[in-house]
C-alpha cells in the first residue's frame, strides 16, 4: 500500500492550529477538500449571478417599459389599460405623479437587486452588498408607496392589491438574501484557506 505523502508533520500543524482532534486527512487530502468546497461555492455564485442578475435587470427594464412608460407617460385610455394601474386607477396630476414615483421606485428595486446579484461574478463583494442594500431600500419604499396608494388613491385595499404592492420588496429581499449567503460562503472559503495554510509560516 502506498504511504500517504505528508509535507509537514501533522502534530506540528495541529499544535499551530490548536487542533486536538484526531487527524483523519493528511495535508494533500485536506487541500483537495478545500478546493472542492471552493469550486462548489463558485459554481453556486455563478448561477446566482446569471439567474438572479439577468432576471432582476430584465424585470426592471420590462416593468419600466410596460408600466411606467406606457401608463404614466401615456395618459388617458392608455393609463387605464396599463396592467398594474388598473388596480390603482387614480385621477389628477398629483396622483399620477405619485404613481409615476411608485413605478420608478419599483423599477429601481428590480434593477438594483438584479445588478447586485450580477456583481457576484467578480470579487467585488462589498459592492454587491451595497447595491443589494440600495435595492432593498428602493423595494421597501416602492411597496409602502403602492400600499399607501391603494388606500388613499383607489380606496380598495384588499389582499390582491396588498400582494401586488409587496412584490418589489419581496424581490429585493430575496436578492439581498442571495447576495449575503454567497458573500458569506466566499468569505468562509477564504477563512478556511487561511487556517489550512497557517502552518506554512512555521
Located regions from the model:
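Non-transmembrane, juxtamembrane loop and terminal tail segments
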Residues: 1-32, 185-202
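Hydrophobic alpha-helical membrane segments
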Residues: 130-152, 169
